[in-house]
Regions:
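Two-component/phosphorelay signaling modules centered on CheY-like receiver
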Residues: 15-34
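Acidic, metal-coordinating helix/loop segments flanking the phosphotransfer/catalytic sites
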Residues: 34-54
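Conserved phosphotransfer cores of two-component systems
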Residues: 46-50, 73-79, 100, 121
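Conserved phosphotransfer microenvironments
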Residues: 52, 56-73
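Alpha4 helix (beta4-alpha4-beta5 surface) of REC/receiver domains from two-component response regulators
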Residues: 68, 89-105
């Protein structure tokens, strides 16, 4: 987030919710990108590469697909922040997602303000770490 517009991919198969989330990120100064499936998310990340700073992933995308998405994202871009937004908070799901590389696992309902704050915080911490290195 070093004086550049942060880019986020919103990966949610609900088109209305995806649009709603992207609009809120835009209002907070983000450049947003839509993905309605795990494959679209991978394709978008392949297209945009290191310009992507964060990805929000809907936990409704089957757990195994979400895990494979996270694994593939990590292979493509180790620095992107991955946020899983789940409908339920089973501890084993959270542990698995975090073990495979998710940066945050949050259970819905959660306000957009809270989601954006979590993303902002992770990006700020990453920028500070990059400066300190």
């Amino acid at each position: 987030m070093q004086n550049k517009i942060p880019h986020v991919i919103v990966c949610d198969d609900d088109a209305e919710l995806n649009s709603f989330m992207r609009n809120h990120f835009k209002l907070d100064g983000y450049e947003t990108h839509q993905a309605l499936s795990a494959q679209e998310c991978i394709d978008k990340l392949a297209e945009l590469g290191d310009t992507i700073d964060a990805i929000t992933v809907d936990g409704k995308i089957a757990s195994d697909r979400s895990i494979m998405l996270i694994v593939n994202v990590r292979r493509m871009n180790k620095n992107v922040k991955v946020f899983v937004l789940a409908d339920k908070g089973l501890s084993e799901d959270k542990v698995r997602m975090m073990d495979y590389g998710a940066d945050e696992f949050t259970v819905k309902p959660i306000s957009m303000e809270s989601i954006i704050n979590k993303v902002n915080l992770q990006l700020l911490e990453a920028a500070r770490s990059a400066v300190a290195s």
